[in-house]
Amino acid sequence: MKTQLLRFNGARQRDPAVDAWMKEHPGELGAIARRWFEVMRKCGDEVRELLHDGCPVACLGDAPFGYVNVFTTHVNVGFFHGAALPDPARLLEGAGKFMRHVRLKPGTSPNVEALRRLIHAAYSDIKARVENG
């Protein structure tokens, strides 16, 4: 059974609201969020962004593929179709039907290459979903 794609109106190439959110999150947690959202921004020319549920979301056009969010002690790098992504490094957490996230804490060393691969896989996945209807 094919699922309907989630779509967000108002995604822009560079949303000032996302930049404002980044400025509102200084310090180590904010730096972690900025670093990984920047990787999402650079996935392709069609990447758009917006704030949704209070956090930055990266989209292919209007179809979301990733987000970052800052919490008290950690940052989540999340994926809207994370349950479908290959994760040989077992970074993904969550038990929902679709979404998964990677929890990053200051002072720990994440598997940078594995997380980068997850972000690019999420972008490729949403691109295929959009192109194949």
Give the ranges of each region predicted by the language model.
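Charge-dense, helix-prone N-terminal extensions
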Residues: 1-133
